[in-house]
């Protein structure tokens, strides 16, 4: 994969976080932001460097990055989101924000979408489903970490509309749990930019 033109050109040295100029006036300087995710947050086709590393380099964000490619929201796999949420983040770190990637892997691995629970239900979620796992994350972050949190969506070719359906459900859960949504999937400016710069994406999901 790494021999492809998109990988080589998109990961040219000029695009490394090392080449970014630090902005001391950024409102994010010194903020502590935790990231939980999979391949996009890791930088799977970008030599392990993602937007998280650019936030650290350009804006002086103090990042904690828990990422394993191919992992899912749903389930209790040792490498999965729910287990890493417990093991990789500490209340003593006093995060300013927690950001969770809305994984594209749940559909790919055949995880059940599940159903949203009533507005007054705050425990006992079916964590073997994607929506149940999301609600467990929503319960856990305020309880364990006591900070605001947000989910971000990914780019993906989605002819079956399964990821789009998950995003629709995410917005419904936002009303219950009060988290932010950074919606890249529906961001027309980003879609136009990646179309104009094909080497910016290795495939439909992963940036270079």
Describe the function of each predicted region:
Residues 3-35:
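Membrane/wall-proximal cationic-aromatic binding patches
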Residues 29-35, 40-123:
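Conserved SGNH/GDSL esterase-like catalytic core that processes O-acyl groups on lipids
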Residues 51, 84-85, 130-137, 166-170:
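A general structural detector for well-ordered alpha-helical segments in enzyme core domains, enriched
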Residues 55-56, 141-142, 173-174:
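A generic structural signal for well-ordered alpha-helical segments
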Residues 62, 148-149, 180:
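Proline-centered loop/turn at the N-terminus of a beta-strand
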Residues 101-105, 135-169:
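Active-site segments of SGNH/GDSL-like serine hydrolases
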Residues 119-130, 204:
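A short acidic, glycine-rich active-site loop
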Residues 154-208:
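Catalytic His-Asp segment of secreted/periplasmic serine-dependent ester chemistry enzymes
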């Amino acid at each position: 994969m790494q021999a492809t033109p998109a990988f080589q050109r998109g990961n040219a040295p000029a695009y490394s976080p090392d080449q970014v100029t630090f902005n001391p006036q950024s409102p994010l300087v010194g903020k502590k932001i935790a990231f939980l995710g999979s391949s996009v947050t890791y930088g799977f086709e970008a030599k392990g460097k993602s937007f998280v590393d650019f936030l650290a380099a350009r804006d002086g964000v103090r990042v904690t990055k828990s990422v394993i490619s191919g992992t899912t929201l749903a389930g209790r796999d040792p490498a999965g989101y729910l287990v890493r949420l417990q093991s990789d983040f500490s209340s003593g770190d006093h995060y300013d924000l927690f950001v969770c990637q809305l994984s594209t892997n749940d559909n790919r691995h055949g995880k059940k979408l599940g159903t949203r629970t009533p507005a007054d239900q705050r425990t006992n979620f079916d964590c073997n489903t994607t929506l149940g796992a999301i609600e467990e994350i929503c319960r856990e972050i305020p309880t364990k970490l006591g900070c605001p949190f947000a989910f971000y969506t990914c780019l993906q070719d989605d002819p079956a509309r399964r990821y789009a359906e998950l995003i629709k459900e995410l917005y419904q859960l936002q009303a219950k749990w009060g988290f932010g949504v950074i919606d890249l999937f529906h961001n027309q400016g980003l879609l136009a930019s990646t179309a104009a710069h094909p080497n910016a994406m290795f495939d439909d999901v992963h940036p270079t």
